[in-house]
C-alpha cells in the first residue's frame, strides 16, 4: 500500500509488505526489481487494448486460481501463463484505468492517452530499495513477527449492524470479492490482542469493530472516497445508510 511504500522510500525504514493477492504481489516484485522493463511493456499498451488485455488477464492461471469453486462458470477460461513482467504490466494497465479502480473492472471514461503515458513514466523512475513484498496470509505474518511494528489494512467488516456502512466486499473486485468475503476478522482480532509489538490497524468504523478492539486507541480520520465518484444512483443499501458512501467511515486502531 501507499503508506508502507512511503515509509520505506522517504524514511528509509526497512519495510516488509505482505498480501494474499498473488497478482498484486507479482506487480510489486517486478516494479521493485525491473522498473525499466515494466515501463517498456506498459508503455506499449493503449486504451484501445483494454478489452483484449482484460481477457488475457482473466485467462491468466493466477486469475483462474481465484475462481476455483466459484458458483458459476462465468469467469472460467482455459488457463494461460504470462511472463511476470507482462503480467505486471497488464495488471497495472487494467487496474489503473478501470472504474473504481478494481481488478478486471471496466474502462473508466476519465482516462486519456496522456494520463496513461504519465502513469507509465512513474514506473520508470520508481526506486524503493527498503521495501520487500511477499505473498502471505495475515496469520503467518503476525505469528512470524511477534515483536515488530505492524500496519494492517484488512478487508472491511461486512456483517449487518445499525451503524455499519459497508455492505459489499470489494477485494479484488466487487463482483468476485474472494479475498474479502472469506476473511476471518475474529482470527485477526485474536492475533492482534496477543501481539507483543505495536500496530496500526485501519478498519471501517462500526460498533462490532470498536467492541473487538476495546482498550486500544481509536482515531477517526476524515476524507472522501474516490471509488465510484460521480455515481448518482441510490440503491436500497445507500438509502438505509443515509446515502453518504463518499464520506469517510474509517477507524484507525492503535497499540502503542
What are these regions (language model features)?
Residues 1-16, 29, 120, 124-127, 136-149, 157-256:
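Class I S-adenosyl-L-methionine
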Amino acid at each position: 500500500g501507499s503508506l508502507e511504500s512511503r515509509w520505506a522510500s522517504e524514511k528509509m525504514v526497512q519495510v516488509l509488505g505482505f498480501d494474499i493477492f498473488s497478482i498484486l504481489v507479482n506487480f510489486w516484485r517486478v516494479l521493485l526489481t525491473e522498473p525499466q522493463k515494466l515501463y517498456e511493456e506498459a508503455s506499449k499498451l493503449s486504451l484501445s487494448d483494454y478489452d483484449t488485455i482484460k481477457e488475457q488477464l482473466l485467462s491468466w492461471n493466477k486469475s483462474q486460481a481465484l475462481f476455483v469453486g466459484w458458483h458459476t462458470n462465468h469467469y472460467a477460461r482455459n488457463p494461460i501463463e504470462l511472463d511476470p513482467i507482462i503480467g505486471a504490466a497488464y495488471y497495472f494497465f487494467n487496474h489503473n484505468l478501470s472504474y473504481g479502480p478494481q481488478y478486471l473492472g471496466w474502462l473508466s471514461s476519465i482516462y486519456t492517452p496522456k494520463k496513461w503515458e504519465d502513469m507509465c513514466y512513474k514506473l520508470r523512475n520508481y526506486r524503493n530499495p527498503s521495501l520487500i513484498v511477499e505473498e502471505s496470509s495475515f496469520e503467518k505474518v503476525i505469528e512470524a513477527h511477534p515483536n515488530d511494528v505492524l500496519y494492517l489494512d484488512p478487508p472491511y467488516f461486512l456483517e449487518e449492524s445499525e451503524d455499519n456502512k459497508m455492505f459489499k466486499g470489494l477485494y479484488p473486485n466487487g463482483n468476485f470479492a474472494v479475498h474479502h468475503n472469506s476473511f476471518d476478522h475474529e482470527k485477526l482480532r485474536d492475533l492482534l490482542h496477543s501481539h507483543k509489538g505495536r500496530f496500526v490497524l485501519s478498519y471501517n468504523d462500526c460498533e462490532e469493530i470498536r467492541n473487538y478492539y476495546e482498550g486500544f486507541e481509536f482515531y477517526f480520520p476524515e476524507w472522501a472516497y474516490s471509488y465510484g465518484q460521480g455515481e448518482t444512483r441510490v440503491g436500497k443499501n445507500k438509502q438505509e445508510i443515509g446515502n453518504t458512501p463518499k464520506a469517510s467511515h474509517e477507524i484507525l486502531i492503535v497499540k502503542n
